């Protein structure tokens, strides 16, 4: 990646919330009811930190109903059922999960850290906790000649779950990526 990951301090988050409250009041004059945490996948943060962020959001925006953000399947797996339920109660809802595919062959090759069964299990846990979610599907990730197989595997998994929506993005291969090297070596075809 062209940047390194770092967590924002709670002081920075509070400063952002103060500024957002000031601007929202000036621009809209309406109560803000939804926010979306940005910057990679904030759901990777520990439960306690997510709860503190929710508390701060509700302090500055008392009418806040939902808090969304990007998440990975592995982030969900790191949280207990009780924590997921508490996060739901704190307003977390409408996560955007980059599942990319439910094609196990592609998931293994891309070293995503999860398989189709994990998508089913972890999103089922979100369903039980009352946390809604949407998916990003990545066309092309299954490789040359495997697009239909990847789409069918993904549809089979997605149809067992309850995503609010499924968005499709195209695979982009960067020259400094591991996938680009695999293509150069002849191990994967676009």
Please report, for each region that a protein language model flagged, where it lies by residue.
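Aromatic/hydrophobic pocket-lining residues that form the small-molecule binding cavity
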Residues: 13, 17, 50, 80, ...
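Short linear capping/connector segments at secondary-structure termini
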Residues: 34-40, 138-141, 184
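Conserved C-terminal portion of the radical SAM core fold
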Residues: 94, 117-178
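Short glycine-enriched, charge-decorated loop/helix-capping segments at active-site entrances
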Residues: 2-4, 109-114, 186-188
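Active-site mouth loops of central-metabolism enzymes
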Residues: 7-9, 70-77, 142-149
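Conserved SAM/AdoMet-binding glycine-rich loop
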Residues: 22-132
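Canonical Radical SAM [4Fe-4S] cluster-binding loop centered on the CxxxCxxC motif
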Residues: 1-15, 19
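C-terminal accessory regions of radical SAM enzymes
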Residues: 179-190
């Amino acid at each position: 990646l062209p940047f390194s990951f770092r967590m924002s301090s709670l002081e920075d988050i509070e400063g952002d919330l103060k500024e957002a409250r000031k601007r929202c009041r000036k621009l809209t004059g309406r109560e803000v009811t939804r926010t979306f945490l940005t910057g990679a996948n904030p759901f990777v943060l520990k439960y306690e930190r997510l709860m503190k962020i929710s508390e701060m959001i509700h302090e500055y925006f008392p009418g806040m109903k939902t808090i969304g953000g990007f998440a990975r399947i592995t982030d969900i797996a790191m949280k207990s059922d009780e924590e997921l339920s508490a996060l739901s109660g704190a307003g977390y809802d409408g996560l955007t999960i980059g599942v990319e595919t439910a094609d196990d062959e592609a998931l293994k090759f891309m070293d995503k850290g999860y398989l189709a069964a994990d998508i089913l299990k972890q999103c089922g846990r979100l369903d039980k906790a009352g946390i809604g979610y949407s998916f990003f599907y990545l066309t092309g990730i299954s490789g040359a000649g495997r697009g239909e197989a990847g789409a069918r595997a993904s549809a089979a998994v997605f149809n067992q779950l309850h995503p609010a929506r499924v968005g499709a993005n195209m695979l982009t291969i960067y020259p400094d990526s591991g996938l680009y090297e695999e293509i150069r070596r002849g191990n994967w075809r676009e």
